[in-house]
Amino acid sequence: MFNLILWPLFLLTSVAIPLQLTLEVVYLTSSVDFSKASAAKTATSLGQSPVVITIYKSLLKYWSLYEFIHFIYLYTPIDAFLNFLPFTSLLMSFGSICLTRELVYDFIAFMESQNKLTGFLNKITEPNFNSYLLFSSIYNIWFADDTNDKFLFGKLTQILISVTKRYEFPRTFYLAKVSDFLQNLILTRLRPFVTEQPQGDKNRYQNGDRESTKNGAAYQKSSQQSSSFEQNFTSTEFPNDYDFMEDILDETTELD
């Protein structure tokens, strides 16, 4: 009976709301007509919007963690062990709520950077804004037509933002910590397979070195000439402070 109550809450916080935020971000950031916008203006706008990069990274980390837990972790013996522990569903629901709140906070920061929050949403944090005004405002949002609504899901997204801004909790960063931990763990496990060279490849390379001993001097001479040519070419044509992207942007601006 307890799981029947927590399971819808877990689906809402772990799937429905993150999917809603993901589609909202894609919808709001796809309003730029890239066929008409120049490359210089597009790159400049992206470079001046670090909050956009932050929300994309947060969504990528969340869905990567979701895939890892539901399609890799749940098929291991650890899942069978957790089924015998009490309050496992409660802990999973609490964890999904914490991670989803972090996504909502990043989405609110993204909306504030884009200046797309309405006047109602900006008044949520005022001291005289009580719970009665909150629910009455939610009622007005749901049943009143808003011509300035820019959200894909409309009033559902406005209600989600308004409730989150009204009942704020201390900001946490569990999503970034868990994602970095799993990334380091996976890289640590994969590093021996990448750095280790098979014995067959070692023997093959050793035999190849013996056969190419006669041509070693000629190859070394040609490689030295090639290296000197690359150094001279790099020093004359491409200095150390050369930025290829800035060159492209300058040429694109001149064409515009």
Swiss-Prot record:
Residues 197-243 are annotated as: Disordered. One of its GO terms (biological process) is cellular response to nitrogen starvation. One of its GO terms (molecular function) is protein-macromolecule adaptor activity. GO terms for cellular component: cortical endoplasmic reticulum; endoplasmic reticulum membrane; membrane; phagophore assembly site membrane. Residues 222-238 have a biased composition (Low complexity). The chain crosses the membrane at residues 68-88. Keywords: Autophagy, Endoplasmic reticulum, Membrane, Signal, Transmembrane, Transmembrane helix. It is a single-pass membrane protein. The keyword Transmembrane applies. Disruption phenotype: Partially blocks reticulophagy, and the double ATG39/ATG40 knockout almost completely blocks this pathway. Leads to a more densely reticulated cytoplasmic endoplasmic reticulum (cER). Changing residue 245 to A: Impairs interaction with ATG8 and decreases subsequent reticulophagy. Acts as a receptor for reticulophagy. Directs autophagic sequestration of folded tubules/sheets derived from the cortical endoplasmic reticulum (cER) and the cytoplasmic endoplasmic reticulum (cytoER) into autophagosomes. Is not required for the cytoplasm-to-vacuole targeting pathway, mitophagy, pexophagy, and non-selective autophagy. This is Autophagy-related protein 40. It comes from Saccharomyces cerevisiae (strain ATCC 204508 / S288c) (Baker's yeast). The lineage of its organism: Eukaryota, Fungi, Dikarya, Ascomycota, Saccharomycotina.
